Swiss-Prot record:
One of its GO terms (cellular component) is chromatin. It is linked to Speech-language disorder 1: A disorder characterized by severe orofacial dyspraxia resulting in largely incomprehensible speech. Affected individuals have severe impairment in the selection and sequencing of fine orofacial movements which are necessary for articulation, and deficits in several facets of grammatical skills and language processing, such as the ability to break up words into their constituent phonemes. A chromosomal aberration involving FOXP2 is a cause of severe speech and language impairment. Translocation t(5;7)(q22;q31.2). Residues 292-305, 438-459 have a biased composition (Low complexity). It comes from the Eukaryota. Residues 422-426 are annotated as: CTBP1-binding. The leucine-zipper is required for dimerization and transcriptional repression. Transcriptional repressor that may play a role in the specification and differentiation of lung epithelium. May also play a role in developing neural, gastrointestinal and cardiovascular tissues. Can act with CTBP1 to synergistically repress transcription but CTPBP1 is not essential. Plays a role in synapse formation by regulating SRPX2 levels. Involved in neural mechanisms mediating the development of speech and language. The keyword Isomerase does not apply. GO terms for molecular function: DNA binding; DNA-binding transcription factor activity; DNA-binding transcription factor activity, RNA polymerase II-specific; DNA-binding transcription repressor activity, RNA polymerase II-specific; identical protein binding; protein homodimerization activity; RNA polymerase II cis-regulatory region sequence-specific DNA binding; sequence-specific DNA binding. Residues 504-594 bind DNA. Forms homodimers and heterodimers with FOXP1 and FOXP4. Dimerization is required for DNA-binding. Interacts with CTBP1. Interacts with FOXP1. Isoform 1 and isoform 3 interact with TBR1. Interacts with ZMYM2. Residues 1-46, 281-339, 438-465, 649-668, 678-715 are annotated as: Disordered. This is Forkhead box protein P2.
């Protein structure tokens, strides 16, 4: 019996083993089929999956029972070698399908699976379900993305097609418009074949009308210029300065060409007018002056001017004047002399231009291109003419003022003379070689450029009248406050002038500092407040370099009349009026003289003559600084001034020995002269020139203190 039971158990175990292997293989095959079916078709419903799982479980159970029944037929010999095996793990992995509770009970009763294996089976089943859900979601997302991409591609294709259609339509429309325009042009040409020719004719007529208007305007300008020239020559003839023969008359008004001149010829005529003036004015050298406006003081220009004969003007022959020949002569004179009134120091002197030109040829090109005969140039000429007229009015006022001064000083006034008309639109006056050769007593003079015309002076009694122009420039000048003339009387009427014009005020730094302190409310100012008063009151100190501040500090520290006081605000400066008035009285009671460091061989007449020359040269009046122009009246004026200051005329000859003929001229260059500018009396003339002097030997150091900082004004 024991043997039989043993054989049954062995057979059962072997059968179980064989049955389980077959079951596991079937379950694996079923799981593969299920997975493949799940992978291929994700659309199978859960109900169908459960149904398949139940069928597979039933088949597995049936096969297991059949194997157990047939296992008893096998021999038990194999049980010696084989041990009873438990259910393989593959049974748990057979399928992730849902198992019913009945099937679970049957499996537990038959002891096919242990509880642990069942738990693992359930976990795997849940994991597979999650994977299936994720796969389904992933497939859905991919389908949606593909669908969106397809829609986008379709939309892009549609847009491209629409754009292409629009472009094609636009091209067709443009082609149609071009065709229509061509057809219209052809029709117009067929209908109006001469319309274009008419338009061209109208344009030509308009151009001709403009040219005719310009010609008329230019002729008017030439007429005005010639009238001024005739008036000037008549005034000179009345004064007896020149004698005009009948054959050498000015250009008559009728000599203007009425028509038939091109703009180039008109421009040449315009240039010729200035050349005619410069050539005619060479004849005025008999009166002792050279009023040529050509800035040519070089040797080459003097040779050419000396070689060129005077130009004579004849009447018109066949409607054309002899101005063309004069133009050729003057143009050749300008080219050989390589100089021009409107050209100096490499800069174009045309008003408002100041273009840099490297050489004279480039200047001529610039002049012909930029300053051709047009509306702008003619307007600038009109402005320059107005400037000259204003300067002439100013000159007449200054002449009247000087005559009144001479009458007050018991001197013989000069005869009033009409102011000459300007010979050129550019008021630059120089000394030429022709003038130097005709007057042997004259000295060589460097060319300068004042801003006002100068009246001619004859050999008889005349008046030296330098024109006072606001923009003369910064010149070293001293105020005549030594003669008890208050500074406020000078600044008050000319306050706006000094505030806006770039003119150096004719006062010492000490006088200006005192005025600034006296104008303050508490009669004391700090250094910065003094600086502010300088820049606020005078435009000169605003627009120039601030080197004058060193001079202000220098005067504050060295003059005894300025006292430095310490207070809560800091250091302030006040004025000691007693010391200031004492300083003024010392200068007034000193021994004044006009000349310092004059050689003993020179007399007082030569000294006064030289001092006048130096003062005039410093005042930018080169024509008047010629000793040949200083006559007996001018020497008498100097004698009277010297008498008022010093009280004696013992060293001066009453017959006017201070004339140029009596004074040794080679020693003039070694003379050092102090020059004192005058106080302005009205706003029209803010500054005028009176040569006064004050030099005290005992106050030499004090004078140098005042004069040293003023040298910075010339920078």
């Amino acid at each position: 019996m024991m043997q039989e039971s043993a054989t049954e158990t062995i057979s059962n175990s072997s059968m179980n083993q064989n049955g389980m292997s077959t079951l596991s293989s079937q379950l694996d095959a079923g799981s593969r089929d299920g997975r493949s079916s799940g992978d291929t078709s994700s659309e199978v419903s859960t109900v169908e999956l459960l149904h398949l799982q139940q069928q597979q479980a039933l088949q597995a159970a049936r096969q297991l029972l059949l194997q157990q029944q047939t296992s008893g037929l096998k021999s038990p010999k194999s049980s010696d070698k084989q041990r009873p095996l438990q259910v393989p793990v593959s049974v748990a992995m057979m399928t992730p399908q849902v198992i019913t509770p009945q099937q679970m009970q049957q499996i537990l009763q038959q002891q096919v699976l242990s509880p642990q294996q069942l738990q693992a089976l359930l976990q795997q089943q849940q994991a597979v379900m999650l994977q299936q859900q994720q796969l389904q979601e992933f497939y859905k997302k991919q389908q949606e993305q593909l669908h969106l991409q397809l829609l986008q591609q379709q939309q892009q294709q549609q847009q491209q097609q629409q754009q292409q259609q629009q472009q094609q339509q636009q091209q067709q429309q443009q082609q149609q418009q071009q065709q229509q325009q061509q057809q219209q042009q052809q029709q117009q040409q067929q209908q109006h074949p001469g319309k274009q020719a008419k338009e061209q004719q109208q344009q030509q007529q308009q151009q001709q009308q403009l040219a005719a208007q310009q010609l008329v305007f230019q002729q008017q300008l030439l007429q005005m210029q010639q009238l001024q020239q005739q008036q000037h020559l008549l005034s000179l003839q009345r004064q007896g300065l020149i004698s005009i023969p009948p054959g050498q008359a000015a250009l008559p008004v009728q000599s203007l060409p009425q028509a038939g001149l091109s703009p180039a010829e008109i421009q040449q005529l315009w240039k010729e007018v200035t050349g005619v003036h410069s050539m005619e004015d060479n004849g005025i050298k008999h009166g002792g002056l050279d009023l040529t406006t050509n800035n040519s003081s070089s040797t080459t220009s003097s040779n050419t001017s000396k070689a060129s004969p005077p130009i004579t003007h004849h009447s018109i022959v066949n409607g054309q004047s002899s101005v063309l020949s004069a133009r050729r002569d003057s143009s050749s004179h300008e080219e050989t002399g390589a100089s021009h009134t409107l050209y100096g120091h490499g800069v174009c002197k045309w008003p408002g231009c100041e273009s840099i030109c490297e050489d004279f040829g480039q200047f001529l090109k610039h002049l012909n291109n930029e300053h051709a005969l047009d509306d702008r140039s003619t307007a600038q000429c009109r402005v320059q003419m107005q400037v000259v007229q204003q300067l002439e009015i100013q000159l007449s006022k200054e002449r009247e003022r000087l005559q009144a001064m001479m009458t007050h000083l018991h001197m013989r006034p000069s005869e009033p003379k009409p102011s000459p008309k300007p010979l050129n639109l550019v008021s630059s006056v120089t000394m030429s070689k022709n003038m130097l050769e005709t007057s042997p007593q004259s000295l060589p003079q460097t060319p300068t450029t004042p801003t006002a015309p100068v009246t001619p002076i004859t050999q008889g009694p005349s008046v030296i009248t330098p024109a006072s122009v606001p923009n003369v420039g910064a010149i070293r000048r001293r105020h005549s406050d030594k003669y008890n003339i208050p500074m406020s009387s000078e600044i008050a009427p000319n306050y706006e002038f000094y505030k806006n014009a770039d003119v150096r005020p004719p006062f010492t730094y000490a006088t200006l500092i005192r005025q600034a302190i006296m104008e303050s409310s508490d009669r004391q100012l700090t250094l910065n407040e003094i600086y502010s008063w300088f820049t606020r009151t005078f435009a000169y100190f605003r627009r120039n370099a601030a080197t004058w501040k060193n001079a202000v500090r220098h005067n504050l520290s060295l003059h005894k009349c300025f006292v430095r006081v310490e207070n809560v605000k800091g250091a302030v400066w006040t004025v000691d009026e007693v010391e200031y008035q004492k300083r003024r009285s010392q200068k007034i009671t000193g021994s004044p003289t006009l000349v310092k460091n004059i050689p003993t061989s020179l007399g007082y007449g030569a000294a006064l003559n030289a001092s006048l020359q130096a003062a005039l040269a410093e005042s930018s009046l080169p024509l008047l600084s010629n000793p040949g122009l200083i006559n007996n009246a001018s020497s008498g004026l100097l004698q009277a001034v010297h008498e008022d200051l010093n009280g004696s005329l013992d060293h001066i000859d009453s017959n006017g020995n201070s004339s140029p003929g009596c004074s040794p001229q080679p020693h003039i260059h070694s003379i050092h002269v102090k020059e004192e500018p005058v106080i302005a009396e009205d706003e029209d003339c803010p500054m005028s020139l009176v040569t006064t002097a004050n030099h005290s030997p005992e106050l030499e150091d004090d004078r140098e203190i005042e004069e040293e900082p003023l040298s910075e004004d010339l920078e």
